[in-house]
Design a protein with these regions (language model features):
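Active-site-adjacent alpha-helix of alpha/beta-hydrolase-fold enzymes
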Residues: 102, 109, 113, 153-181, ...
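Cap/lid segment of the alpha/beta-hydrolase catalytic domain
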Residues: 35, 84-93, 195-206, 286-295, ...
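C-terminal motif of bacterial Sec signal peptides marking the signal peptidase cleavage site
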Residues: 22-23
Length: 363
């Protein structure tokens, strides 16, 4: 127990440094276009993410379950895991600090299991309460979803037990066992896995893309969508850099979003409306500001998109003094509504889906 306390204390010091950091990399300015209006079918949207992106994928799924039919959680845990018991009593940054402490110690390292963190049963009850209050979509819409979960055997950042807790959380909500796939036998580090790009399989380092001879993009898309056409040899569509600011509106400065996001548009989706949308959330230190287009172009999503009429949205978060690693908000740095459909990041990404659904402006 003493060693656990020592680790927790070290993590708290790390958190204090994170929250008081004064500098971050300057965002580069680049030419951007408007998000193309493609007449997309957003009622069969799927989401995926790694690390903080995994938590955001789960949060977006819960908030907009009527639109989302599947979620892929890579090196992430259950929805609401980081929320402190003091969330309703300590205002502002104090709650975010407590949430972040819980996030690292209880939702990544799994050091708080003896204190009931992360309890899938309790988290499912809290999710049901949020749904009853109308803060997220009805749980009944989640129970029809297809779920993919992944933990690499060489991942020392997020404990395998945390990912298993996520699988248990979905089961507690009522998602059938047949709809849940947990992959835990690949020696990957803390990274997105491919069969032809990235670092050596066991590495956990930028750009957090590794080659394990496993096509994770294809695996998770098949789990969520079912049978797909074989992927293309090379991607032939367009990676469009678009301005994210209109989707955050007046909350842009506090949303944590980067100015520029990316959407991959297959040629078939420019020519004919009705393409489905997959939203891929990057992990911490995996945004374009940090690793360029490595995750976007090396993950393999585009090759599957080309042959299956699938638009892939890559929204982006920026590094900042309160979020120096450019993580998605899964502990409340954007405010207390971070788990609800009113969360700045969730609301902005949902507006991006609305923009893709619009017609008459295909570019």
């Amino acid at each position: 127990m003493t060693s656990l306390i020592r680790i927790a204390a070290r993590n708290l010091l790390f958190l204090a440094v994170m929250l008081t950091a004064t500098g971050c990399r300057e965002a580069s300015h680049e030419a951007t276009a408007a998000l193309p209006a493609l007449g997309a079918n957003i009622n069969e949207t799927t989401v995926s993410g790694i690390s903080s992106g995994a938590y955001m994928a789960g949060q977006f799924q819960m908030a907009h379950a009527k639109r989302v039919i599947g979620a892929a959680i890579i090196a992430g845990g259950p929805y609401g895991c980081s929320e402190s018991v003091f969330a309703d009593t300590i205002p502002g940054a104090g709650t975010a600090f407590l949430n972040l402490s819980k996030a690292v110690n209880g939702c990544m390292l799994d050091l708080l299991e003896s204190w009931g963190v992360a309890d899938p049963t309790e988290l499912a009850k809290k999710a049901e309460a949020r749904a009853a209050k109308g803060e997220i979509d009805p749980i009944a819409d989640v129970t029809r979803d297809r779920i993919y979960l992944f933990t690499g055997t060489s991942d020392r950042t997020v404990a395998p037990s945390i990912v298993r807790h996520a699988a248990e959380f979905y089961a507690k909500l009522g998602v059938p066992a047949a709809n849940i796939e947990l992959v835990s036998n690949i020696p990957a580090g803390h990274a997105f896995v491919t069969d032809d790009n990235g670092n050596a399989c066991e590495i956990s380092a930028e750009p957090y893309v590794v080659d394990c001879n496993y096509d994770q993009a294809g695996a998770l898309l098949k789990q969520m969508y079912g049978t797909l056409q074989p992927r293309a040899e090379t991607a032939t569509g367009d990676f469009v850099n678009f301005d994210q600011r209109p989707f955050a509106g007046s909350e842009m400065s506090s949303s944590g979003l980067a100015e520029t996001g990316v959407v991959y548009v297959p040629k078939a989706c420019r020519e004919t409306p009705g393409c489905r949308v997959h939203v891929a959330f990057h992990g911490c230190a995996q945004n374009r500001e940090t690793v360029g287009d490595a995750f976007i172009k090396e993950s393999g999503f585009a090759r599957w998109a080309d042959t299956n009429r699938l638009i892939v949205l890559f929204p982006q978060v920026a590094a900042s003094p309160i979020n120096p690693q450019g993580c998605w908000d899964w502990w409340g740095y954007t405010g207390p509504e971070y788990l609800t459909r009113n969360a700045p990041q969730i609301a902005a990404v949902n507006r991006m889906l609305d923009g893709l659904q619009a017609s008459g402006g295909r570019a």
